[in-house]
């Protein structure tokens, strides 16, 4: 028997915050250098609890969500390096963010403008994981 969803029988979902996104890489130290030195991400964790496991976690400037990569972490490190596409970094001024990354040695594509003034520019890490800078005019007050 199907039950109709009404406001009376739908349980509210509590607030959830995205905390950690795995990014598969082939060389942990090379990726660590890229994200810290080139992208300016904050190194949060770099631990090796066992001989076969290493966990490295970074947070983009101003973000509450971090990325993680390493070795010996089961399904996370079994992912194909370079297979993550379309991670978005929302910025207040895409031209400023793009120039800052270029100034640090990151190859960033040209800014493309789309509907409603949304702008995008993409770059990739050494393994080919693709990141997208995104500027949304209606969110400019957040920066």
What are these regions (language model features)?
Residues 79-83, 87-90:
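Helix-adjacent hinge/juxtasegments
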Residues 34, 95-100:
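Short amphipathic alpha-helices within nucleic acid-binding modules
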């Amino acid at each position: 028997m199907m039950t109709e969803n009404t406001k009376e029988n739908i349980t509210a979902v509590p607030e959830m915050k995205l905390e950690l996104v795995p990014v598969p890489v082939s060389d942990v130290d090379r990726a660590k250098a890229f994200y810290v030195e080139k992208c300016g991400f904050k190194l949060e964790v770099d631990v090796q609890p066992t001989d076969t496991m290493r966990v490295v976690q970074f947070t983009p400037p101003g973000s509450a969500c971090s990325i993680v990569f390493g070795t010996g972490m089961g399904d996370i490190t079994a992912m194909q390096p370079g297979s993550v596409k379309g991670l978005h970094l929302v910025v207040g001024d895409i031209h400023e963010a793009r120039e800052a990354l270029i100034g640090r040695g990151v190859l960033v594509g040209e800014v493309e403008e789309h509907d409603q003034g949304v702008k995008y520019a993409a770059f990739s890490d050494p393994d080919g994981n693709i990141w997208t800078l995104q500027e949304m005019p209606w969110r400019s007050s957040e920066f």
